[in-house]
UniProtKB/Swiss-Prot annotation:
It comes from Cupriavidus pinatubonensis (strain JMP 134 / LMG 1197) (Cupriavidus necator (strain JMP 134)). The keyword Cytoplasm applies. The lineage of its organism: Bacteria, Pseudomonadati, Pseudomonadota, Betaproteobacteria, Burkholderiales. Belongs to the HisA/HisF family. Heterodimer of HisH and HisF. The gene is hisF. GO terms for molecular function: imidazoleglycerol-phosphate synthase activity; lyase activity. This is Imidazole glycerol phosphate synthase subunit HisF. The active site is at 11, 130. PANTHER family: IMIDAZOLE GLYCEROL PHOSPHATE SYNTHASE HISHF, IMIDAZOLE GLYCEROL PHOSPHATE SYNTHASE SUBUNIT HISF/H IGP SYNTHASE SUBUNIT HISF/H. GO terms for cellular component: cytoplasm. It holds the Pfam family His_biosynth. It comes from the Bacteria. It is found in: Cytoplasm.
Length: 256
């Protein structure tokens, strides 16, 4: 079995790392370069870096911050936020990103994913999906895709959208439960499992990690290939090393 990845996530706005609850109530967590360097030293497998207001604010890419982080961090760096065209993918790769995450722009123009993977390869294109449960209690579970940092409903079914994005060449799906984001109540395992079982590409589970058991559950019960977390790492609750040691004790293969 391939090693499962632990990925700290840096949500950035106005040049600072922030963390919210259910995509709002943002709280400052520090300087992105310092935080990224700390996670590299702790043994993170990758770092994901999302400019969470670039699309809704209509801002350009934060290339200067990406360059600064890439100069200090020597593990794969995924960058998302404000990517609107294949040219943006090129600019971010040149700035030092290893993988590019697209979200709102993939929904506005699904061909962007096909074009970007055609030009740069599936291995560097991640499609981020922000999903919120839309089914009533007692109904078969359904989740709706949201864009623009969770502000805009699309009417799209999250599982079907993930399948379409994989078919268009996406190398990974970064799946965030909006219902669980920042709540520390654990991943939406039903959502994670539904998407993981439906697509032939790796799924990164995101949204809701409150402790180390949640990370293990995301892999074992959610069938995810990687787990992403922010709050438990940013505020010193756990280090990445502690998370990996716990996963290893649980019998989950990780790179120590």
């Amino acid at each position: 079995m391939l090693a499962k990845r632990i990925i700290p996530c840096l949500d950035v706005t106005n040049g600072r790392v922030v963390k919210g609850v259910n995509f709002v109530e943002l709280r400052d967590a520090g300087d992105p370069v310092e935080i990224a360097r700390r996670y590299d030293e702790q043994g993170a497998d990758e770092i994901t870096f999302l400019d969470i207001t670039a699309t809704s604010d209509g801002r350009d890419l934060i290339l200067h911050i990406i360059e600064a982080v890439a100069s200090q961090v020597f593990i794969p760096l995924t960058v998302g936020g404000g990517v609107r065209a294949v040219e943006d993918v090129r600019r971010l790769l040149n700035a030092g990103a290893d993988k590019i995450s697209v979200n709102s722009s993939a929904i506005a123009n699904p061909q962007l994913v096909s074009d970007a993977t055609g030009k740069y390869g599936s291995q560097c294109i991640v499609v981020a999906i922000d999903a919120k449960r839309s089914s009533a209690p007692g109904e078969p579970p359904r989740w709706e895709v949201f864009t623009h940092g969770g502000r805009k409903a699309t009417g799209l079914d999250a599982v079907e959208w993930a399948k379409e994005m994989a078919a268009r060449g996406a190398g990974e799906i970064l799946l965030t439960s909006m219902d669980r984001d920042g709540t520390k109540s654990g991943f939406d395992l039903e959502l994670t499992r539904a998407v993981s079982d439906a697509v032939p590409v790796p799924v990164i589970a995101s949204g809701g990690v409150g402790g180390l058991q949640d990370l293990a559950d995301g892999i074992r019960l959610g069938h995810a290939d990687a787990v992403l977390a922010a709050s438990i790492f940013h505020y010193g609750q756990h280090t990445v090393g502690e998370a990996k040691a716990f996963m290893a004790r649980e019998g989950i293969p990780v790179r120590i």
